């Protein structure tokens, strides 16, 4: 069942997101692994459309927050207001009470407002005036930021960055893919015509199935060697945390599930390592050239020998 549902989701989103097969697979990996996504790319590359396409495909409630410097934490979480008719305080839910939340241009809001998302992302709950309210599963945050604009922005703190399972960019379209996009959007509105292919209950079942994906003991040691290497590398000031190790684990399990397997293979590590680990590294000043973190992760993967086994064996 899992294979059919995930294949239907991939095909449905691809009706709108032309030429982004890898990104679609990684977004679905985050969804089944219960992880959040940071999409960093220039405007107009389809970040918002990706989030909306996913929400429509899984029959999920979609919420969007346009982050600005004057946005308040209560604009994210909601607030209590006094109802004159009833003479009582009433809670008004904020846009974070949804299944898929698009946090657009998250780095334009102040750190105080950014941190209001932290409890939502980490604990999947919201506390306002001492009252804690759980968020409905599935709950996925897709945050976006523009890497080219830094004026008037507030860089995400490390604690917030560590809460994102993956940091992704949209894929550049080939001439053939761009031609296909023009032809499709010339006479159609693919996003408006997109319909749901699975209910939220099936997504919750996929998230449970992700935890059961088999990881061979040799691959457990392979994972450990990768994260340990980030802590002793001379180019890295601060390596992957234990939370990052567990995120890496869930990501490889999720990617295996998206690929139609109930067991992890070494290729899963190679596919998700950079999106999962690079944004968790603090580089030495002398080594940071913009892509240094990605390059170091790739070097580590190339340096560590791949174990060879029958990965599906129990």
Walk through the language-model features, giving the residues of each.
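Pre-Walker A (pre-P-loop) alpha-helix and adjacent loop at the N terminus of AAA/AAA+ ATPase modules
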Residues: 3-45, 224
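C-terminal engagement/docking regions of AAA+ P-loop ATPases
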Residues: 232-314
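Walker A/P-loop
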Residues: 31-68
